[in-house]
Regions:
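Non-catalytic terminal accessory/regulatory regions of metabolic enzymes
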Residues: 1-168
Length: 168
């Protein structure tokens, strides 16, 4: 049973998708630069407003250079980061009895997506693989830099502009 889906994609009006690059790792965090209309002062003069930059939760779907394929799913941006840490191993298959039962149930074949991971990773013996563990060890991961960029939403550039405006 095949079903067609319609999904909104492409640029959004009044804004532009941008990517903020990491400084420590080869990462790109999707952001949206939203253009603002000018403020009209009490005397009728227009004051231009700087664009506002926010984290873009739309994923690659609003990137005009990305081809959407719902059956393939989203790009697995963390996959290489995890592999590069070399503290996990990839299993040969699903490890839970429930997961294996679902995988072997042919009546569910019509519901499956080709991108579903059937070879999950687990920590190597003696290793811990949580972001909290890495942080306590003083290790900064690509995930941490990604979140820092996402949450700061270019606040450093805003501070710089404010200081310049104030003559500091």
């Amino acid at each position: 049973m095949s079903q067609e889906f319609t999904i909104s994609s492409g640029p959004l009006p009044g804004s532009e998708k941008i990517y903020v690059k990491g400084e420590m790792f080869d990462i790109e965090v999707p952001m949206r630069r939203i253009n603002l209309t000018p403020t009209v002062d009490t005397d009728g003069t227009k004051i231009e407003n700087e664009p506002v930059v926010v984290y873009d939760t739309s994923g690659p779907y609003t990137d005009p250079n990305y081809t959407v394929d719902l059956h393939k799913g989203l790009p697995k941006i963390r996959e290489q980061w995890i592999a590069d840490r070399n503290d996990t191993v990839q299993l040969e298959g699903l490890s839970s009895e429930y997961g294996r039962a679902r995988q072997n149930d042919k009546s569910l074949d019509a519901l499956r997506f080709e991108h579903v991971n059937t070879t999950p990773r687990v920590a190597k013996p003696g290793h811990r693989v949580s972001q909290m563990y890495y942080a306590r060890q003083g290790i900064i991961t690509p995930e941490m830099e990604y979140i820092a960029i996402r949450e700061n939403q270019m606040v450093d550039k805003i501070r710089e502009a404010y200081k310049k405006e104030k003559g500091e």
